[in-house]
Amino acid sequence: MALDKFYNIYGLDTSAFYFDDEMALNRKLDKAKRIKSKCKKRQELLLNSCGDVRRKELISKQKRTLKRVNRIIRETKAELKDLLADRVGLERTARPEAFVPTNIISTFDSDLARCFELKSDVINEEIIVVQIYFFDVAHGLALNGFTYNGNRYCYFSSSAGQIRTKKMVFVREDILNRVWNRLTCGLTVERINELGGVNPNKYLAYLALCNSATDKWEKFNIDKVIVVDDMENIVHGVVDFMDDKDYSINRQEMDLPFTQTDGVGMARRDVIKSNRMFRAPWMKGLLARFAFDDLIREKGWSPIVEDIYGVKHDVLAEDIEIILTKSQFKMWSYFDSWEQYKENFKKYGCSAGYCKAEEDWIPNAKTNYQMLQTLTDVTNRELVTLASKTVNKISNIASDKETMVSMFGVTPHSTNLNAFQEALTLYPELLADPYTKEQLSSAKKAMEYSAWCGKLDIFGKYTFIIPDMYAVCEHMFGGVANPDGLLADGEVYCGLFKRTEKLDCVRSPHLYKEHAVRKNMAAERSERDRWFDTKALYISTHDLISRILQCDFDGDTSLVIADDTFVRIAERNMEGIVPLFYNMAKAPKSIITKQVLFDGLVKAFTGGNIGLYSNSISKIWNSGSITEDAIKSVKWLCMDNNFVIDYAKTLYKPQAPENVKAVIEGFTNAKLPHFFVYAKDKPEESVELRNSSCVNRLRSLIPRKNLRLRFPMMDNFNYKVLMNNPNIEIDKEVIRNYEALVVYASGVLTNADDEAAVWFYYYSKIKNEMLSMGYPESDIVDMLVKYYFHLRKSKRKVTLWNTFGDIIVDNIKRNLDTKFTTCKHCGRRYMVKDDENGLCSECRKTPPEMKVGYRIMVCQDCGRDIGINLTNTRTVRCPECQLAERRRVRMLCERERRKRGQKEF
């Protein structure tokens, strides 16, 4: 998969392109900031040390120092800004000292990476990502590019995510010129400008599609693909219509236009085995697996369909495999015909990629605080019920093997396991190692924090949202203008929950009350089962649900919740709630030039922070009593948030009237909700006191538990299982060299932006350095294992696992006969025969009712095997011996009491 393959590249910031005098000022600024940080730390330490008089003197001195440092920072920053402003547009050269390991970042496999032939075992210099801090420097880079190591680099594009984080992607100009037609299917900027231009930020986003993480679609055949018009219809319903001029809100019935295939197309069942997202030059979206060919034949519909250029196609005669829609082909109007695109696709060696394919098994998910905070009338009993799965999981971390290994991502459905995960699967006794125990303790604390901020395990799954494709085919091939489809208003179909009649469909970000409680038609056996044969959430073309969820269908997912308690609460809270509706602005076109692209980027960088709106809405939902003004404020902020999201394209943001601002500020001037201590690691002084809002109550309803890790169902951990030669003598020089390399890498890591990328780079470097010592790899691994697992019993082994984990796994496989496995009840190893349900011969003899959720334990008094609950770590005797023990203790206590009474007498 694309997310499993990545390449190391450099991620710089604008300081990497400073001239010498600018760099001198930058270093002076950095030094002043370090001094400021130290002064603040000293000031905090002084508050709890020294006598009163001496403490006041030292604090006063630190304040004077801070004042001088702040003045230096202001003056130096102003001088640097003036210097940069005088040099706007100058051509710059990357400073060689910027290309150091701390500036390594990783990029996933993509069409861009494949075109530039990036390699996974080196640091690639063909693509460089630049973080923007000063626009004056970025201006020159965008217009002129830069030079490094004798190569010219030019600005390529920025994805939506990179725009949010103020990043620009630069590539080697000579390579880009060579592969441009392959990336763009022959479309040039000159051609775009001839046809009137395009919105600059849309252009950047569409060009950046080739930088999406994808696998190459080897069997993609462009000759078996067509592009047709989207299905559009009118849906009548009640909405809260919001005016973006005067901010009035009116509940009214409206006929709303919907593009029912916005971002989604179809692929035959024999072409893809599940729904998947795809990318091609200027194309993106979701491909829904749907048997449109079988449906045409069964219904006797005409197989003739017209493409977006007016050419008719017989999808059966032409053996069409994939039908895309106009909304997926972003630059369709700049090609003369579909034939031209196909010819260019083949001529220039273009390719398609896919990503995020629907998994064979979808795990249950977690809620988040946004989904919970809009449920404003939840009782404590209901909250306890919702949190019960999470509480049980936290408790089971202490003693249940399955829960323990699942904390490391090891489940029966796990794929692409790393070395440590594979070792746990083969040798679960590894859970008793100090490193693993330390990780479990950290995981338990993290789970508690997650639970306190609303991340609760729920009976629900994330899955793609897809419109009723049967209705789409009725419209496309049956000629029905407004087809009925297989789903009516208020109905959905999700085959993941065939026994659940009602579902709550939610989506992030979840700002207003956006719980779409719908009837699940998968609970009824019908014709729908034949056509809706994937795990997606299918929605009706007569429903306002896509307006509630604020979704399109280009790969958007919904958390579909089937938990009865949650659905009941959501349905109750949605009484009287209707979708919000407002008219969004259109994005204007521009002639594309380097200056226009940079201006568009600056507007996107400075257009607004959507996080501010989300946090403001959280303040309102957690403010206490939810009044009418509170609800109105949430609606206004939701509208503002969506306009800010589109601001980079539309350059339009509504301005709230003063009276509206006053109402909103009455809520948003407060501090953040208390649970942000756990959700965003905020300090206590920056949040409100804990009140009785839904999410805030979780802290008191889920108390912290001090759990002692126990391993009652496993044999003792033996470090020799991880070794090839347990009798090896340790060379201290090997240990010293390894520790020196780890310490050096850790020091580099403290200044790195992308910690994971830097570590993976150093894992390879550490391994090569160790192998250069002259010992065989197996001997080096044995020495390290013996030292860190046996002699030192270290709690820090992440580098060892990521450097030599594959060798350790091979040793485990060699030392443990693969014909043996551990019994999931008693932990004993036994020989695997046929289907034994994971039980050894002794446990298979136990009664059926004891096989689920029970394990076998030996009574410490009589030695008899007894079945106890998996989570029970206290029982040590069978019931008969425990009763006898209680009698014995009672008799001893009675005897002691009588003795004390006689002495007192």
Residues covered by each model-derived region:
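Beta-strand-enriched accessory nucleic-acid recognition/scaffold domains that flank the catalytic cores
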Residues: 1-550, 557, 563-905
